[in-house]
């Protein structure tokens, strides 16, 4: 989201010239940790509901969704902002000739591929775990065929540099990096990829809500859609 949100911040200057927007881009899991430890933040956009649920006070009685009992967001501000797709991307020239998730599953079983994936504590890694479960793949048994990234950007870089034969990344990251997407995971394989957003409790709730409202406008959505996002339904 680095590129899109940076562009949108520039556009927002025409709407609110006195508002200074500072971003902190990282994996959703790391951002959750930073916010829960007191990092200064007014608006949170997560790459999956899990990390948003973990700070949603309306779920404080649900220990599975909010295990630490955090109450950090303005609950009424929470929305499903964007939808992404989980894709199988390959380096330039696709040297391994990978064409689909079905084929990838067979290559993993034979140990004849190097796949880049996200760590289990970040959303892209969690979606990958669901894809493995769909194909009946044991991640631990595939250790010699897997290389990991701390976030989706690291996975994307491994594919771009051809240090892996392919990688499981978001459609938007593949688009931004100019990578070829050979297949997209279905909802049956890993569920929908929803990006929730919410204002955090604090002194700047009004300004944060105004920017969140702007993110839902046609102007902002056009930027998101240019790299493969769609508005969440």
What are the residue ranges of the model-derived segments?
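Conserved mixed alpha/beta catalytic, RNA-binding, or beta-rich assembly cores of soluble enzyme
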Residues: 64-66, 72
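Exported/periplasmic ABC-transporter solute-binding proteins
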Residues: 1-16, 29, 33-36, 48-49, ...
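Hydrophobic anchor at the start of a short beta-strand
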Residues: 21
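Active-site acidic carboxylates
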Residues: 72-76, 81
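Periplasmic-binding protein-like
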Residues: 42-46
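Charged, often glycine-rich, active-site loop that binds/positions anionic groups
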Residues: 38-40
């Amino acid at each position: 989201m680095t590129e899109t949100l940076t562009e949108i911040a520039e556009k927002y200057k025409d709407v609110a010239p006195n508002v200074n927007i500072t971003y902190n881009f990282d994996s959703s899991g790391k951002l959750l940790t930073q916010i829960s430890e007191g990092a200064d933040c007014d608006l949170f956009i997560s790459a999956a509901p899990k990390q948003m649920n973990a700070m949603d006070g309306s779920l404080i009685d649900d220990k599975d969704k909010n295990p630490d009992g955090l109450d950090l967001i303005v609950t009424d501000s929470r929305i499903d902002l964007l939808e992404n797709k989980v894709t199988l991307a390959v380096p330039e020239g696709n040297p391994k000739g990978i064409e689909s998730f079905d084929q990838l599953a067979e290559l993993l079983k034979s140990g004849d591929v190097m796949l880049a994936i996200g760590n289990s504590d970040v959303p892209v890694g969690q979606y990958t775990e669901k894809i493995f479960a769909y194909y009946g793949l044991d991640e631990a048994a595939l250790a010699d065929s897997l290389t990991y990234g701390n976030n989706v950007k690291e996975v994307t870089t491994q594919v771009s540099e051809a240090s892996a034969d392919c990688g499981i990344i978001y459609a938007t990251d593949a688009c931004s990096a100019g990578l070829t997407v050979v297949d997209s995971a279905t909802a049956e394989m890993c569920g929908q990829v929803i990006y929730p957003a919410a204002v955090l409790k604090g002194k700047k709730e009004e300004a944060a809500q105004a920017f969140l409202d702007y993110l839902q406008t046609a102007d902002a959505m056009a930027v998101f859609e240019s790299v493969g996002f769609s508005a969440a339904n």
